[in-house]
Amino acid sequence: MYRRGAEKSREMMLEELLGYDRITIQCHDNPDADAIASGFGLYCFFRDQGKDVRLLYAGKNKVRKANLTLMVEKLGIPLKYLAHPGEEPVDGLLITVDCQYGAGNVTVIPAEEIAVIDHHPLEVICTEKMRLQPNLGSCATLVWTMLQEMHYPVEKNKDLGTALYYGLFMDTNQFSELSNPVDMDMRESLNFDKNLVSLFRNSN
């Protein structure tokens, strides 16, 4: 496993991952709204491509914050907690989202193939299948961008739109740190449930 600065990331496309029939999407440990939203976006895309896909996280603690448990419940996000990750190696492709496989904030799960989708600076290189865009305010924006590249109809899925909106909202300190035009484009284009966003905000 190579460390910081060993290689420059290229812009991987979701199309490159469609050769896998079984796909596991892993959020970082103790996932926040952005990680959950990003994972949900990828889950919806691969599910609609007919893939056998699951969305999970590991680590010491289950998600317990009221805003996040409400987000998962109200938006129908199939997020599962993996209590014993070493006992269940991943068959097929493992995608880490909003984190990088081998970094300190994500439990390592043995996997045949690995891909990384993240909006943080490069920490660990473990695969050629990487998409890092640290100039974006949220990983939700990166996933939205990748879905746009595939002409995936995000606007038709209000639950997904709500998740992506809330992920950006939380990762940019309630939009106060919003500066990238792509983040702004996503915020303006999403079809989301204002009442649910208010519910999540008020329960945080």
Functional labels for PLM-detected ranges:
Residues I36-S38, G102, L122, F175:
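General alpha-helical segment detector with a strong preference for membrane-spanning helices
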